[in-house]
């Protein structure tokens, strides 16, 4: 049955309960008629994939790292399918790591191919046509030169995949797109005397280009932006704490862009106080003018719950570096899920259990989204948010 039809039937059922209550002389609030009118996007909880683009290490690079840096290999030993498949299986937060490449070609010839050849290993397959990497525009990868295979390339192509899926499923809860701006701060290639590709620095003008690429794919009516959330308030922090985030009624079928790197926020805000005119929500310090979205990836449940109660949108990681997945340790996962973090990120979403232990991060009963365990209103109904996954 189509989800829109299911929601219509549920709405009719809620209407029926409302009328029965009226006949019985009760005075229920009119807001019970439609949860979309009352439930806000920070009052739900969804599962996200960490490094959603990550196609896994190429065979030669993997062998090389196993020999030289087994610890690094272990932390990178995971992969995801294409973005549409992830969305089909209930992932509602995607993470895309991007490198600026304003002239094109900066990442067209990765050092890893030379290192593999020098080690006498078979050449790795080319993950995408060279002309894609020669054109100007933001590129998607984990680490330049060694971990560069992605399920989509370039950044615009990844966004187009999300847009196509969203257009085909217009009733979805908002899709959160976390953007990690990779740069020189991310360090160098371990254990090599060879120079690796120096990333292009992030400047206000580079961020202008990033906003332009996003806007070239998503029209204003398909995004939730800082300006929309701020409204007439002076700051975003004031808006989310006093007035709240948009309701599901205003957010279905849309995307929200979030910035991963806290250091990039001040650069992104130059000339854009409180993110005026910008597309992404920064990973901000609570109480600051851009305060709306916060990352608490260490999984401190008390801190997360306090932030959620204050009105902030929080992303937290249930696992990292394949550590929990190798042992099946679910303690961090369970803390994060119960903390109220609206976005729970993992390398192992419901359809991708860890091959070592079966470790997985999923909402109960196959849910794609659930009412937030900390701040959801009484009007929130899990089955109203999105249909449960059939598998």
Predicted regions and their residues:
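Positively charged, low-complexity intrinsically disordered regions
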Residues: 8-10, 28
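Bacterial N-terminal signal peptides
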Residues: 12-22
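Catalytic cores of phosphodiester-bond hydrolases, prominently lipid phosphodiesterases
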Residues: 27-391
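Extended rod-forming repeat segments used as scaffolds/tethers
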Residues: 9, 22-23, 104
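N-terminal secretory signal peptides that target proteins for export/translocation
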Residues: 1-8
């Amino acid at each position: 049955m189509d989800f829109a039809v299911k929601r219509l039937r549920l709405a009719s059922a809620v209407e029926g309960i409302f009328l029965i209550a009226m006949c019985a002389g009760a005075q229920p609030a009119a807001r019970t008629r439609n949860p979309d009118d009352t439930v806000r996007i920070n009052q739900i909880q969804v599962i996200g994939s960490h490094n959603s683009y990550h196609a896994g290490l190429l065979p030669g690079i993997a062998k090389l790292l196993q020999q030289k840096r087994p610890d690094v290999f272990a932390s990178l030993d995971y992969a995801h399918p294409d973005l549409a498949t992830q969305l089909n299986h209930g992932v509602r937060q995607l993470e895309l790591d991007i490198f600026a490449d304003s002239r094109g070609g900066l990442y067209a010839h990765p050092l890893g191919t030379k290192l593999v050849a020098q080690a006498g290993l078979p050449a790795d397959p080319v993950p995408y046509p060279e002309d894609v990497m020669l054109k100007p525009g933001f590129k998607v990868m984990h680490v330049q030169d060694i971990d560069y295979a992605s399920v989509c390339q370039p950044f615009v192509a990844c966004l187009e995949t999300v847009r196509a899926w969203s257009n085909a499923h217009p009733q979805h809860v908002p899709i959160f797109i976390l953007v990690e701006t990779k740069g020189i701060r991310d360090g160098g290639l371990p254990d090599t005397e060879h120079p690796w590709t120096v990333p292009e620095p992030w400047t206000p003008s580079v961020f202008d280009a990033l906003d332009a690429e996003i806007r070239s794919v998503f029209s204003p009516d398909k995004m939730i932006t800082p300006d929309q959330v701020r409204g007439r308030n002076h700051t975003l922090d004031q808006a989310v704490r006093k007035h709240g985030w948009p309701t599901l009624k205003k957010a279905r079928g849309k995307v929200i862009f979030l910035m991963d790197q806290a250091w990039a926020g001040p650069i992104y805000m130059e000339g854009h106080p409180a993110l005026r005119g910008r597309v992404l929500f920064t990973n901000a310090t609570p109480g600051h003018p851009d305060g709306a979205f916060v990352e608490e990836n260490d999984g401190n449940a008390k801190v997360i719950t306090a932030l959620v109660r204050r009105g902030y949108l929080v992303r937290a990681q249930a696992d990292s570096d394949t550590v929990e997945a190798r042992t099946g340790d679910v303690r961090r996962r369970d803390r994060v899920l119960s903390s109220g973090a609206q976005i729970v990120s993992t390398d192992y979403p419901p359809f991708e259990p860890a091959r070592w232990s079966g470790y997985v991060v999923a909402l109960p009963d196959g849910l794609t989204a659930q009412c937030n365990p900390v701040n959801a209103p009484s009007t929130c109904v899990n089955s109203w948010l999105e249909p449960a996954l059939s598998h």
